[in-house]
């Protein structure tokens, strides 16, 4: 099972190594605006799932939202510690 920390480490490694075929690398290459649109999309899907589709689907959408948030963190040079100090 992945944790917030292990996911961030995995995504950071893919970004640093420019792993061929990586969706993370592709998304980072498309830039902040694209990543932001994905965050908005997943946030909306999370809300719809919570409202109408149940816990399992909501958790799935939340995990996708967290993924895109972490991609944005990497894109903007934000670390886990930056997030933790603001919680």
Curated annotation (Swiss-Prot):
Keywords recorded for this protein, A-Z: Amino-acid biosynthesis, ATP-binding, Cytoplasm, Histidine biosynthesis, Hydrolase, Nucleotide-binding
CC terms in the record's Gene Ontology section: cytoplasm
Subcellular localization, as worded in the UniProt entry: Cytoplasm
Keyword hit for Amino-acid biosynthesis: yes
Catalytic reaction equation(s): 1-(5-phospho-beta-D-ribosyl)-ATP + H2O = 1-(5-phospho-beta-D-ribosyl)-5'-AMP + diphosphate + H(+)
Gene3D superfamilies: MazG-like
Disulphide linkage map: none
Regions crossing the membrane: none
SUPFAM superfamilies found in the cross-reference section: all-alpha NTP pyrophosphatases (SSF101386)
Main subcellular localisation: cytoplasm
EC number in record: 3.6.1.31
Molecular-function GO terms, alphabetical: ATP binding; phosphoribosyl-ATP diphosphatase activity
Coiled-coil segments: none
Keyword Cytoplasm: yes
EC class name: hydrolase
Pathway: Amino-acid biosynthesis; L-histidine biosynthesis; L-histidine from 5-phospho-alpha-D-ribose 1-diphosphate: step 2/9
One GO-annotated biological process of the protein: L-histidine biosynthetic process
Database matches in CDD domains: NTP-PPase_HisE
Record-stated family: Belongs to the PRA-PH family.
Protein name: Phosphoribosyl-ATP pyrophosphatase
Organism: Bifidobacterium animalis subsp. lactis (strain AD011)
Name of the coding gene: hisE
